[in-house]
Amino acid sequence: MDFIISFIKNLFGFLTIKKVMILGVENVGKTTLLYNIYKFYSENITTTTLSSLPIPIPTNGFNVESIVIEQVKFDIWDIGGKETNRICYRHYLTSEIDSIIFVFDSSDINSLEESKKEYQYLKNQISLKNVPFLLVANKQDLKQQTIEIDEILKTYFDKSSINETILMSQNNNDDLIKCINWIFSN
């Protein structure tokens, strides 16, 4: 039945819609990642809209941006990482999610334990059992990083449960392209 619906949608030019969630604890760069993806790939972006994009501040609630790539519309949700937001976003964790990008700050040792707990919580959700996860080790460009990324992954994250890991610096378009390619392929 899904095949028939998909065929009819494609026949009449309808878009496939994919829901992507960007999750993680606070101050890890989720909103910056969302707007960098939007800036990089939005087909409708102009100089005016680029300058009017919000300066990322800690998100209270959520942000949603949509981009279209090759007949696929991606609704990308960035949900604030404060504990009060994380309690609320758990209501959105359904099997309708197509992929999850879990972001953590690889330069902040103090936030890694909290990130580990949140990641484990998400991976244990039955509704997310078949949802692919991308683990983004963000802020690779910051000099205060004292632990190597392999050590972080070994200590704080179950490598066997990770579909893919991307080391990211927000100013590096190659990292951003890897992230976007992963979203598109999952």
From Swiss-Prot:
<comment type="function">
    <text>Binds and exchanges GTP and GDP.</text>
</comment>
<dbReference type="Pfam" id="PF00025">
    <property type="entry name" value="Arf"/>
</dbReference>
<dbReference type="InterPro" id="IPR024156">
    <property type="entry name" value="Small_GTPase_ARF"/>
</dbReference>
<dbReference type="GO" id="GO:0005737">
    <property type="term" value="C:cytoplasm"/>
</dbReference>
<protein>
    <recommendedName>
        <fullName>ADP-ribosylation factor-like protein DDB_G0292332</fullName>
    </recommendedName>
</protein>
<keyword id="KW-0342">GTP-binding</keyword>
<dbReference type="GO" id="GO:0005794">
    <property type="term" value="C:Golgi apparatus"/>
</dbReference>
<feature type="binding site">
    <location>
        <begin position="78"/>
        <end position="82"/>
    </location>
    <ligand>
        <name>GTP</name>
    </ligand>
</feature>
<keyword id="KW-0547">Nucleotide-binding</keyword>
<dbReference type="GO" id="GO:0003924">
    <property type="term" value="F:GTPase activity"/>
</dbReference>
<dbReference type="InterPro" id="IPR006689">
    <property type="entry name" value="Small_GTPase_ARF/SAR"/>
</dbReference>
<dbReference type="InterPro" id="IPR027417">
    <property type="entry name" value="P-loop_NTPase"/>
</dbReference>
<dbReference type="InterPro" id="IPR005225">
    <property type="entry name" value="Small_GTP-bd"/>
</dbReference>
<feature type="binding site">
    <location>
        <begin position="138"/>
        <end position="141"/>
    </location>
    <ligand>
        <name>GTP</name>
    </ligand>
</feature>
<dbReference type="GO" id="GO:0005525">
    <property type="term" value="F:GTP binding"/>
</dbReference>
<dbReference type="GO" id="GO:0016192">
    <property type="term" value="P:vesicle-mediated transport"/>
</dbReference>
<comment type="similarity">
    <text>Belongs to the small GTPase superfamily. Arf family.</text>
</comment>
<dbReference type="GO" id="GO:0006886">
    <property type="term" value="P:intracellular protein transport"/>
</dbReference>
<feature type="binding site">
    <location>
        <begin position="24"/>
        <end position="31"/>
    </location>
    <ligand>
        <name>GTP</name>
    </ligand>
</feature>
